[in-house]
Amino acid sequence: MPGIIGLITRMPREWAEPQLQRMVEAIRHESFYATGMWIDESLGVYVGWAARKSSFCDGMPLSNERGDAILAFSGEEYPEPGTARRLKERGHAAEAEGPSYLVHLYEEDPAFPASLNGRFHGLLADRTRGTAMLFNDRYGMHRIYYHQTKEAFYFAAEAKAILAVRPELRRVDPRGLGEFVSCGCVLENRTLFEGIQVLPPASAWILRAGAIERKDSYFQPREWEEQAPLEPEAYYQEIREVFSQNLPRYFTGKDRVGVSLTGGLDTRAIMAWYKPSPGSLPCYTFGGTYRECRDVLVARQVARACGQSHRVIHAGGEFLSRFPHYAERAVYLTDACVEVNRSPDLYVNEKAREVAPVRMTGNYGDQILRRLRAFKPGEPVPGLFVPEFLAHVHAARKTYNGLLQTHPLSFAAFRQGPWHYYGLLALEQTQLTLRSPYIDNDLVRTNFRAPESTCENNDLRVRLIGDGSPTLRRIRTDLGFGGRVGYLPGAAFRRFHDFTFKAEYAYDYGMPQWVARVDHLFSPFHLERLFLGRHKFYHFRVWYRDALSEYVREMLLDRRTLSRPYLDRGRVEAVVRGHLTGGQNYTSEIHKLLTLELLHRLFLDGDLPQNTQRTQVKTVQSAP
């Protein structure tokens, strides 16, 4: 994921600058990335960056008029309208568009970066104070890793940048690995790599002379948790006002915006209130090969009702033919924070970038407005892992249960967001800029005042859509919400699509073993065609069994895989052969095993892969 990297050190420049160069090279993954470095030897600051060309944070670093405040910023910030103008009226050289206002905001706002709104991280060097401040957004969504040695403090948007210069860290952390196996992500700001941590949300750490001076935090969730709750009608009016007034901020900037339109409520609400002029906002939906899924069918209706173009981006034969590439790339780009089943997302986002470099989504709408919990610990198939490692897997459940002892919205926004959702966000942002109005500061703060009754169903969003566009209110969602009035027709419609949704899950990776054996007997009839593709666009149970069987066999029955110390060799062989030829369903286990093996091959065994975009990174500015 594009971002900043670097080190703070008192070591000589001849020691530090080559490391910075290697760190920048490690995260330049695409030809459309812009990279650079800035160095101040007197402060011991060595900072670099990678940014998508023409994006909000292209053109770093930022400087004030005197040149004593320098900012390297990554991500996006959605300020109050008129912020740059007001700073210019106070004598600052802030441009009307772009991020230049940020460094001037630091000069005016003693609480900086508390007023910022978005997903971001940055390093601000203050030559007057002789310090550097490393900061991130209040949700911790724009991740930054760090590592401290006696020589330097390292920080990076991707762990691989630190691994590139500190090879002794290329060893797995057993606790983090156990959490990843159990929960699908690492908890409590740990990582898969021993000695590398994640900067906590809302950090504003002060660094001096190559070390951490203070670990400040500019925000605590209790500031929002302790607000007085609102009555249902007052809450709805407040949410409606915040959503409608702040939404236009997310459509600003130089780059073209496309909407990743689904059949659900969250993108529908965006379309209902943004009201784009006809033909100005390209829309697209991700689809599969069996049939047009409900997302495609409904999204097409929504786009047509709004006067916008719509296209389907398919993940099918081309993707499957290059699955090894996309699987390995997905794991590598995210520092193994996603499993290989997210590789289709890399493929479709490459295609989405051709439509528009900014992708508007409804991400996090359910999690914020309804406080939904999207992940929980799982139990591995018996015997797959050796008992010594299984203890770490079981410990993850205890850790997770402890983390639930907080406000449910705080869990969703400040824990689930930066841990569970980070991997997919990081993967997608390697290709384009993702935006969502559902983690807007004002909206999340207001949602902490929601009465519990409004979080129990979809009524609030259906009403919000209707107030913005009665036409869009009349189109049923992919699962049958909204649309025509009348209990029986609506209830029957919802029951039918709820059944097809669950049936697709049961026929894909959720298929019970006894059903898998029956399905195996009838495999010549391809019964999957009856169920798959109605709601999802990827189908790994069948793919692993058929199109990807050779890759699965070569990877997981390889002697290197079978020799991993935490795996039971015989059980791994039984899982692979059972899924490929024995009429059993081990889709989730194969996801995990492939991901763990790629973790070893890409990060732990031998040298890190060479970046195909490797070029000499220029130092755009340097201070003696």
Residue ranges, per PLM feature:
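Conserved structured core elements
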Residues: 233, 237, 241, 268, ...
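ATP-dependent adenylate-handling ligase core
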Residues: 288-348, 366-384, 400-402, 431-432, ...
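Catalytic metal-binding/acid-base residues of hydrolase active sites
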Residues: 266, 364-365
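Glycine-rich phosphate-binding loop signature in dinucleotide/nucleotide-binding domains
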Residues: 252-254, 352-356
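Glycine- and acidic
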Residues: 224-233, 257, 283-287, 329-334, ...
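Conserved glycosyltransferase catalytic-site signature
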Residues: 98-102, 117-119, 174, 296, ...
